[in-house]
Amino acid sequence: MTISLDSLRLDPPVLLAPMAGITDLPFRRMVARFGAGLVVSEMVASGEMLTAKPSVRAKAQAELTAGLPTSVQLAGREAAPMAEAAKIVADMGAEIIDINMGCPAKKVTGGLSGAALMRNPDHALRLIEAVVGAVDLPVTLKMRLGWDEDQLNAAEIAARAEAAGVKMIVIHGRTRMQFYTGAADWRAIAAVRAAVSVPVVANGDITDAASARRALDQSGAAGVMVGRGAQGAPWRLAQIAAALFGKADPKLPSGSEFSDFVSEHYEAILSFYGRDLGLRIARKHLGWYAEAAAAPLRAEMMRATDPAATLALIRSAFSEREAA
């Protein structure tokens, strides 16, 4: 099974979700090493892209080493800045532009972007049309089922987005007001699937092959998008692809290979962000990798401020660990 977006093929149809502060270039490269159909950048605010700040532009870097298509996700409330940001991102090497209409965070919806766009479909469609018209790239859309249980309008917006030129639609099976509580309603995604002919991808609570299979069965979707399930497990998408789509089983790191892998990711973060910011960002990834480690060792790793000391702790924590 393959998802086609114009000339691009997303094979396998197991995609990495955009996650703010997580799916940066170092993490996307780690996922790409094991395999995925697509990796998506963390959300980039369109207005900030126009400022040319290096820290913002870094979020939209698209260079990978495994030949995977890369999508850059843009968020914003107004059509013109979104269109201009899309042009910039295209010039930087993105192969796909994704529009964020699903982020539930108050700091995003309070600015009338993210999932808040679902409350005003006419305005959202003007924004979508502007982005589609600005670039010669496939444009995709990620959204939720609706704002709340009284506004379940994902199918309506999806149909209009397809007419505007959107090539793929990803649905997180919750409303904005649910945030991440309760369970994702994969069956509700089927209504969106029935409303459009472009590929629909299921997202939300997909953490392993079993949940991916249930999501596909219940939604009828063309593929799955994995977010939190990949935290601390960049190989998770490849495992799902092997179980469901006949891809080769990924070779998972174990023993010294595992500590080498975590060390490489840690050093890549420091190289990308610089020492001080990199130390802060690396801690969450180390925390996910170290969930099975002894509590005192894990706590010491979270407190460490010296890279050499942290690398020694990584070797101590992971030298006998096996990926799962």
From Swiss-Prot:
Named cofactor requirement(s): FMN
Name recorded for this polypeptide: Probable tRNA-dihydrouridine synthase
CDD domains, sorted: DUS_like_FMN
PROSITE patterns noted in UniProt: UPF0034 (PS01136)
Source species: Rhodobacter capsulatus (strain ATCC BAA-309 / NBRC 16581 / SB1003)
Family, similarity comment: Belongs to the Dus family.
Record EC number: 1.3.1.-
Any Pfam family hit: Dus
Gene Ontology molecular function: flavin adenine dinucleotide binding; tRNA binding; tRNA dihydrouridine synthase activity
Active site: 103
Broadest EC class assigned to this enzyme: oxidoreductase
Keyword RNA-binding assigned: yes
Entries under InterPro entries matching the protein: Aldolase_TIM, DUS-like_FMN-bd, DUS_fam, DusB-like, tRNA-dHydroUridine_Synthase_C, tRNA_hU_synthase_CS
UniProt keyword annotation of Kinase present: no
Residues the record lists as binding FMN: 18-20, 73, 142, 203-205, 227-228
